[in-house]
Amino acid sequence: MVFHADCVDGGERKGDNNDNGKDTIQIIPLRLSADIRPNDELDTLILRSLEQRQEQIFDNDVLVVAHKIVSKAEGRVVNLEHIKPSAESLKIAAEDGKDARIIELILDESKDMIRHSNGVIIVETRHGFICANAGVDQSNVEDSINHAVLLPVDADASANKIRESLREKTGGKDFAVIITDTFGRPFREGQTNVAIGIAGIEPIKSYVGSADMYGKKLRVTEIAVVDEIASAAELAMGKLERVPVVIIRGYKYQKPEKESSAISKLIRPKEKDLFR
């Protein structure tokens, strides 16, 4: 595959998804200069950014959106002054030295606490994600000392809303939407961008039953393509560049047989989880 570096850096390479060559994938960043406020129309802001970049959405593109702007638009920013910590939150705060109000939010956003240590709380969120601090985050938010951002309540629904609204405004273009967040990983340092909500794309590409290059039949290989797309998008997003939206162009993804797709397909059942 060829990744156009000029597109990652903000260049102006154009072209339909179908005329870039079979082995070319483009990563196209879209900057949003204004801070997102509750009830902001993300579709309008994305279209404005596309116009400023002299770009457009094509059929088969993948629109990757950082959850932070979705959460802000959906009013998922919490004023910590309004949070009253429970006895459990105060107990954990005394042990770990973490703000008890943040702990209260983490517990509210979780259905199970797996463990906590050194200021990190590993939980199973209400969505089913296993992650640190339930995605509760104080970065890239105004007055971060007193505010925190939560994950969208239903990121699949958020992705579908963005997709349908943009399809209506782009003449019915058929593209996918992935909403992302950065998660840590067991046994490896560093975080990676992963999908937390999807629309118009199957999250897994299965090679089960296919033969490898030497004819051996594959039995278990399934690739979480939406996570890999999310990680590719992070190369252009970063954390400081005001690039919360990226277009991935040229990747041939599988569309769902039914109209809807769900991130829940990526969540491993507890009985198959060897790490808990």
Where are these regions (language model features)?
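Short, low-complexity, charge-dense intrinsically disordered segments
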Residues: 6-12
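Intrinsically disordered, low-complexity segments enriched in serine/threonine/proline/glycine
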Residues: 12-20
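N-terminal and secondary-structure boundary signal
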Residues: 2-3, 19-276
